[in-house]
From Swiss-Prot:
It comes from Neisseria meningitidis serogroup C / serotype 2a (strain ATCC 700532 / DSM 15464 / FAM18). Bidirectionally degrades single-stranded DNA into large acid-insoluble oligonucleotides, which are then degraded further into small acid-soluble oligonucleotides. Belongs to the XseB family. This is Exodeoxyribonuclease 7 small subunit. Its EC number is 3.1.11.6. The lineage of its organism: Bacteria, Pseudomonadati, Pseudomonadota, Betaproteobacteria, Neisseriales.
Length: 74
């Protein structure tokens, strides 16, 4: 099976939704297995992307939350 490399998280999520829809209908067994395998690869890709974003957010928030001042000093 070839390695799945979506261009973005959103593309992977869209493909997962499409696979889910197609698997809910009538599908030959071999096609269903291939769709399941592709779905697993896409889920792993999405989980990795989410973990990377979470890690970046933790780095950005390392100094703790900042107070937001919405009042202008005019």
């Amino acid at each position: 099976m070839k390695k799945i490399t979506p261009k973005s998280f959103e593309e992977a999520l869209s493909r997962l939704e499409s696979l889910t829809q197609s698997m809910q209908g009538e599908m030959p067994l071999e096609d269903a297995l291939a769709a399941y395998q592709e779905g697993n690869e896409l889920v792993r890709y999405c989980q990795t992307k989410l973990a990377q974003v979470e890690q970046k957010l933790q780095v950005l928030d390392a100094d703790g939350p900042k107070e937001l001042n919405l009042e202008s000093d005019e």
